[in-house]
Design a protein with these regions (language model features):
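Gram-negative outer-membrane beta-barrel transporters
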Residues: 1-90, 117-119, 128, 148
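Membrane-spanning beta-strands of outer-membrane beta-barrel proteins
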Residues: 2, 58, 103-104, 142
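Surface-exposed coil/turn segments at beta-strand junctions on protein surfaces, enriched
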Residues: 12-14, 68, 101, 113, ...
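C-terminal beta-signal and adjacent terminal beta-strands/loops
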Residues: 81-92, 105-153
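Outer-membrane beta-barrel domain signature
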Residues: 48-54, 95-99, 134-136
Length: 153
């Protein structure tokens, strides 16, 4: 069972700038884990320390700002905040649920159109080198730079 609110807006005040904002608020209840009478989990137990579905944050925020230098060149800064979320434990902690910490990731993307046929994309992902986990004991990648050349037909 889950319900929530999602807001998304985009604003382009002029030909040089574009902005985006997104917010998600989620409430959910994982009855398969927290209501299972055969499990050690249950409301208030250490094995079910939060009743949210696993890996679903209550709050998530996305901010995007783009500077458009010309018809061929733009640069975008992306910021993503993900709130705390519940995850399953494993043998290392007696299979008790855990709470994954909130985190902020910042990406920088540059797009350049070449000859109206190619699009060069250079992405600097996680530029602040945030250390976080999307799943218990599985660390997310650190800072990375990606290059992509795409041909448009």
């Amino acid at each position: 069972e889950s319900y929530g609110l999602e807001l998304q807006t985009n604003w382009k005040p002029n030909d040089e700038y574009a902005f985006g904002f997104g917010y998600t608020r989620t409430e959910s209840y994982d009855g398969t884990t927290c209501d299972n009478p055969d499990s050690t989990a249950g409301p208030g137990s250490a094995a079910c320390n939060d009743e949210m579905n696993v890996r679903v944050p209550r709050h998530q925020v996305n901010l995007i700002g783009t500077k458009i230098f010309s018809n061929n060149l733009s640069q975008t800064l992306k910021l993503k905040y993900v709130g705390e979320r519940r995850d399953y434990g494993n043998i290392n902690n007696g299979f008790e649920d855990v709470i994954l910490s909130n985190y902020v990731v910042v990406d920088l993307v540059t797009n350049y159109k070449l000859f109206d046929t190619y699009n060069l994309n250079i992405s600097a992902k996680n530029i602040l080198d945030a250390r976080y986990s999307d799943a218990y004991e599985y660390k997310a990648p650190g800072r990375a730079i990606n290059f992509m050349l795409k041909k448009n037909y």
